[in-house]
């Protein structure tokens, strides 16, 4: 799976940042890699179902398998499972979904897995263990740093208000900008890869009435009609 993971997940991760967007590699991995591999292995072992440790739940609604949030809303992982197909969900069990994380840890200790229960949690992307995606992009894209350095920060009027190290190193909604633009907090509200600019605005500027979406899964519905 290493080659397929590199092409489907890592290459997409890099391409999205270069396109000025922020990717979520876990969604793609679940959709295109993890479930396919697990079910293939399950078929080899003549297993009807697979179980994963995701904090989410599955219910049948109108003949369709629908993902719901786990009982533990703090640890909920339903949002990274939206792309998993109906066929895959029909063979999937989420035993963790009806528990809180603290309950799982107590169960692990009671069953003799105390060291596992006390293991620190990881929030990093699996292929970026140091969680430094900027350095990762620089290693993956030859000459990236030289190409995107000395980009312009713009205000909402399009005026240049400062310099940055490259648009791929920012994400919409980001507040930590490496410099101050006044007394009030500033946020990234726009990224333009074509001219290497990052637009800065207020938190209110992040509020939008229109958004563009793609790769939609309607959950309870197989499709929706226009109008």
Which residue ranges define each predicted feature?
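A short, polar/charged loop-to-alpha-helix boundary motif
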Residues: 123, 169-180
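Basic, glycine-rich polyanion-binding accessory segments appended to enzymes
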Residues: 184-186, 192-227
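Short beta-strand/strand-turn micro-motif
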Residues: 150-169, 182-189
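Core alpha/beta nucleotide-donor-binding catalytic domains of modification enzymes
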Residues: 1-117, 121, 126-147
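Short, ordered coil/turn segments that flank beta-strands lining enzyme active or ligand-binding pockets
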Residues: 106, 156-157, 194
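Short coil-to-beta transition motif at edge beta-strands of beta-rich domains
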Residues: 150, 170-175, 225-227
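A structural signal for short hydrophobic beta-strand segments in well-ordered beta-sheet cores
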Residues: 56-58, 188-191
């Amino acid at each position: 799976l290493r080659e397929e993971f590199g092409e489907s997940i890592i290459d997409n991760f890099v391409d999205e940042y270069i396109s000025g967007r922020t990717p979520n590699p876990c969604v793609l991995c679940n959709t295109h890699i993890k479930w396919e591999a697990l079910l293939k292995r399950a078929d080899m072992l003549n297993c009807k179902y697979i179980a994963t440790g995701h904090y989410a739940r599955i219910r049948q609604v109108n003949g369709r398998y629908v993902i719901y949030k786990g009982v533990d809303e703090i640890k909920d992982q339903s949002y990274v499972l939206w792309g998993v197909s109906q066929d895959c969900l029909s063979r999937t069990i989420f035993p963790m979904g009806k528990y809180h994380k603290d309950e799982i840890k107590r169960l692990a200790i009671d069953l003799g897995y105390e060291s596992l229960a006390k293991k620190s949690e990881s929030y990093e992307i699996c292929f970026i263990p140091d969680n430094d995606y900027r350095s990762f992009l620089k290693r993956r894209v030859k000459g990236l740093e030289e190409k995107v350095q000395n980009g312009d920060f713009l205000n909402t009027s399009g005026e240049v208000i400062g310099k940055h190290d490259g648009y791929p190193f920012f994400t919409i909604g980001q507040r930590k900008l490496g410099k101050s633009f006044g007394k009030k907090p500033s946020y990234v509200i726009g990224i333009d890869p074509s001219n290497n600019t990052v637009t800065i605005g207020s938190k209110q500027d992040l509020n939008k009435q229109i958004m563009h979406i793609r790769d939609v899964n309607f959950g309870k519905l197989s499709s929706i009609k226009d109008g």
